[in-house]
């Protein structure tokens, strides 16, 4: 197991995080996120980012907007996505990060989705309620990348993840021969010591990988030019968000919210969401399938909101892109997103063999 000496911390945020009073901490982090964003953008854009759709799947409607959305449908539909990010690190090397490379077929081993299959049957769960768009392997091939091109894997959190196929473990060979997992120390300690109320969302044994393939992070990490991982605890204790700067804007990606309107709920056309936010006085509405750290999750969403800024395409909405994007579906009436922003894509993803050319 490794720490991350080659990565820099983002400025301003760590001091604000040390505040113990939740309301004061929120305001300090609101200001600190703006300061950190300014420094982040000044350094210049990322080399490249590509967004790849993996699978559309059902998710309890009561969780998606913390119970605010009014619909007879028991499930919303969400599309899980992977970002392929290439950035130049402090040594001047172009590195490749896969953010949320979900091995989604193995994710069905998590108790929640295993029970869903048992309730509805494999055909309905896999064919009617789900749509497969492509695997991690097929998307990498379409981008001209090989497994050996990948330097790092990271996830916003480890719900539904089985890392063994990617990194080895439990007798399995590693699909990625060089890649190391970047994970917050708090997330790693959580998944190794799950509370009974947390186990429903985790794949049993999914984190049993060789320790030398794991890099533990402590807070906000500046990976390289135009690429960072923000510590955004709350949804899980070690939740983190991808931040990417292009020449025009900053993208932020996580699953703290299920749609960009989660960050501007007064603009939501989904029945119930705007009224819910008005009634409670909330400026963000949580993806609420975990409740142990809701204050932290709310604060983290404000950090994401400040760091991302507003969309250059739809200026009233925050440039937040859910790792699992709320998706229109016939089985989810009145639960379509108000708006879907163009997916994060920028630059030219290059295989390692062409990087020096």
Language-model features: locations:
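Active-site neighborhood of phospho(di)ester-bond hydrolases with catalytic His/Asp-centered motifs
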Residues: 98-100, 151-158, 182-184, 231-234, ...
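Beta-strand-turn-beta hairpins that frame and shape the catalytic cleft
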Residues: 42-49, 86-96, 221-229, 248-251
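Metallo-beta-lactamase
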Residues: 104-105, 128-134, 139-141, 145, 175, 194-197, 204-208, 220-221, ...
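Active-site environment of divalent metal-dependent phosphoester hydrolases
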Residues: 157-164, 189, 236-240, 260-262
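C-terminal regulatory/interaction regions
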Residues: 1-44, 293-357
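Active-site metal-binding motif and surrounding structural segment of the metallo-beta-lactamase
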Residues: 118-179
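Conserved beta-strand hairpin/beta-sheet module of binuclear metal-dependent hydrolase folds
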Residues: 56-139, 241-257
């Amino acid at each position: 197991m490794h720490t991350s000496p080659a990565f820099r911390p983002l400025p301003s945020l760590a001091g604000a995080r040390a505040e113990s009073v939740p309301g004061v901490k929120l305001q300090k982090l609101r200001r600190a996120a703006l300061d950190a964003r300014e420094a982040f953008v000044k350094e210049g854009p990322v080399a490249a980012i590509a967004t790849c759709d993996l699978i559309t799947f059902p998710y309890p409607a009561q969780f998606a907007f913390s119970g605010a959305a009014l619909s007879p449908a028991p499930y919303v539909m969400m599309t899980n996505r992977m970002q392929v990010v290439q950035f130049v690190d402090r040594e001047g090397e172009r590195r490749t990060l896969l953010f949320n490379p979900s091995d989604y077929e193995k994710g069905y081993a998590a108790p929640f989705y295993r029970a869903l299959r048992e309730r509805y049957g494999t055909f309905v769960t896999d064919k009617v309620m789900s749509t497969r768009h492509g695997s991690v392997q097929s998307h990498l091939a379409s981008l001209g990348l090989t497994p050996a091109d990948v330097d790092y894997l990271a996830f916003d959190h480890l719900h539904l993840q089985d890392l063994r196929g990617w990194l080895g473990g439990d007798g399995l060979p590693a699909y990625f021969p060089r890649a190391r997992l970047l994970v917050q120390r708090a997330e790693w300690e959580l998944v190794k010591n799950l509370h009974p109320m947390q186990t429903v969302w985790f794949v049993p044994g999914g984190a049993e990988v060789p320790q030398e393939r794991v890099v533990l992070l402590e807070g906000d990490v500046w990976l390289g030019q135009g690429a960072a991982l923000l510590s955004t605890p709350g949804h899980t204790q070690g939740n983190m968000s991808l931040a990417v700067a292009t020449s025009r804007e900053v993208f932020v990606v996580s699953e703290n919210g299920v749609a960009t309107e989660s960050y501007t709920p007064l603009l939501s056309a989904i029945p119930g969401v705007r009224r819910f936010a008005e009634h409670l006085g909330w400026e963000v509405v949580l993806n609420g399938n975990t409740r142990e750290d809701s204050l932290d999750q709310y604060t983290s969403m404000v950090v994401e909101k400040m760091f991302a800024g507003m969309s250059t395409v739809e200026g009233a909405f925050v440039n937040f892109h859910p790792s699992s994007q709320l998706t229109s579906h016939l089985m989810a009436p009145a639960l379509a997103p108000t708006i879907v922003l163009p997916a994060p894509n920028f630059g030219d993803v290059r295989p390692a063999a062409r990087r020096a050319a």
